[in-house]
Structure formats: structure tokens, C-alpha cells
Amino acid sequence: MKLLFMYLLPLLYIAPILLAVAFLTLIERKILGYMQHRKGPNVVGPFGLLQPIADGVKLFIKEPIRPSTSSQLLFILAPTLALALAMIMWTPFPLPIPYSNLNLSILFILAISSLTVYTILGSGWASNSKYALIGALRAVAQTISYEVTLALIILCSVLLAGGFTLSAFAISQEFTWFILPLWPMFLMWFVSTLAETNRAPFDLTEGESELVSGFNVEYAGGPFALFFLAEYANILMMNTLSTIIFLGSCMSSLTLTTSLLMTKASILSLCFLWVRASYPRFRYDQLMHLVWKNFLPLTLALVILYVSMPISLLFTPPLPWKRA
């Protein structure tokens, strides 16, 4: 029985994430529909609730077409690896108990998220299509650029939390959320997560007018669905990480902790979708100008400020107080 549970545990961990990803796509289509004064999916099942299941079945029963000039092994390996990395990133998350409690969990998440670059680059190169390759190179440059600011913001929050574990963030935010002292960091973090997950207005990799569909232009059926699942799993993961780092969590009971974490992450995910419905796509030079000439100097200045403030106040006497 214990052996069976050991094999079933990863499945029990992955299944709810995939289910959440499926319904996130439905919520996105519904929100975009209502923002454009239309209904969105409303045919399959009650209120269109079974639309993601129908889409998944449709994609996986389609014939997997592979270009004859493509690198066959890498072409199939790239989407599989993308989804595998997206699932691995969830292991240190306290939901409320982590599947794998790591000492350096925040660095582990950052390292695995940077590995997703190789899946995008691999898919673009293996497709043997100029559109896919240009889209992949854009995605790689964009992801690497915005990871610099993400790492600096994480460094600053780690200095305040006093540890690299995600549970340390929950404990240190018991009285005050980090979003209050770090609100400029949070705004830059939110924009950087949009760019990191290749979402609008930073979806330069999928510029229809110039790149058809981006790095996954040659994919259809099952492999395309794997890329789709990986993208939305990364969106949910980034929003959950934003919640843990900046919006704290309740430590009173496990059920309340999970409910509040899910609610805050859902609200941030809705903000992602709202941004997509509201803003046009950036030009590529504007995208790079934003990170290298605006975000990077500002995050460096704020990191120096947050590091130097405690040191500068180290030898000052404590504030006088009177006994009541």
C-alpha cells in the first residue's frame, strides 16, 4: 500500500495543476469575450465549462504532423521537456505542504525557469523553419534579459525574508506583507513575469504579422498542446510565486492557507488576462529598452538602498520609549 501511494503521489500532485491550467484557458477566453462584448465559449457543457476538455481531446486525437526536414528527435523532445520542467517547478511550493522541501527552493525555481529557454530554442531550431527560429531567438533574448531583474528582485526579498526557502517568506510576512515596503519592486516584478512567460504585451515571439505563430508554428496536435499546457502552467506558477513572495500567507490552518494562496494567485492571473485584453504589443526595441535602461538600473538602486539602510542605522541608538 505504501509503495502504491509512493507511485501515486506525483500523479496526485500533477493532476490538479493540469486541471487548473485547463480551466485557466477557459477563464481567459471568457474574460476576453466579455471585454470584447461577446459571450465566449458557451456551447460545450453547461456555460461552456467542458470546452477545455473538448479542446484537449481534439488536439490529442489529431495526427501529429512532423516536417520532413525537421530534426525528428528534438522536435518531439522539446514540448515534452517544456511540460516536464513546468511541472518540476511546482515541487518546492508550499501548497500548503511542499512535495520536496528544499533549502534553496527559490533558487531552484529560478534555475529551472531559465532552463525552459532551451526547450523554446530547441523547438525553433528543430522545426527547420525561419519563422520558428526567429521567434525562438526572440524568446531566448527576452527571457534572459528579464531574468536579470527577476533575480535582483528575488535577492532583495530574500534579504528581507532571511532565507531562501518559500516557508521563510510565509513566516516573515506574518504581520506585514512585503508588497508594502517593496511596492516598486512588486510592480517591476509583475511586468517582468509578463515578459518571462511571453504574455501580452510582450508576446513578441508570436507576432502574427511577421512570424505567423512564433517558435511553435510547425507544431500541431499533441505536441502543440504540450507547449500550451507548459505556458499556462508557468503563468500559474509565476503568480503563485508572486503571492508567496509579496502577498504573504496565513499560518493559522492548512485549509485557510491553501484557500488564501489560491485566491490571491487567481486574482493575479486575472490581472494577466486583463493586461492581455487592454494593451497592444510592444515593439522589440521598446521591450529591450524597458529592461536594460529602466528596470535594471532601478532594481540595482533599490537593492543597494535596502542593503545599506540597515547597515547605516546599525549604530544609531534605539528610539526612546516610556513605560506605561
UniProtKB/Swiss-Prot annotation:
The chain crosses the membrane at residues 3-23, 73-93, 106-126, 151-171, 175-195, 226-246, 255-275, 295-315. GO terms for cellular component: mitochondrial inner membrane. It is found in: Mitochondrion inner membrane. Its EC number is 7.1.1.2. It holds the Pfam family NADHdh. The keyword Translocase applies. GO terms for molecular function: NADH dehydrogenase (ubiquinone) activity. GO terms for biological process: aerobic respiration. Keywords: Electron transport, Membrane, Mitochondrion, Mitochondrion inner membrane, NAD, Respiratory chain, Translocase, Transmembrane, Transmembrane helix, Transport, Ubiquinone. It catalyses: a ubiquinone + NADH + 5 H(+)(in) = a ubiquinol + NAD(+) + 4 H(+)(out). Core subunit of the mitochondrial membrane respiratory chain NADH dehydrogenase (Complex I) that is believed to belong to the minimal assembly required for catalysis. Complex I functions in the transfer of electrons from NADH to the respiratory chain. The immediate electron acceptor for the enzyme is believed to be ubiquinone. HAMAP family: NDH1_NuoH (MF_01350). This is NADH-ubiquinone oxidoreductase chain 1. It comes from Aquarana catesbeiana (American bullfrog).
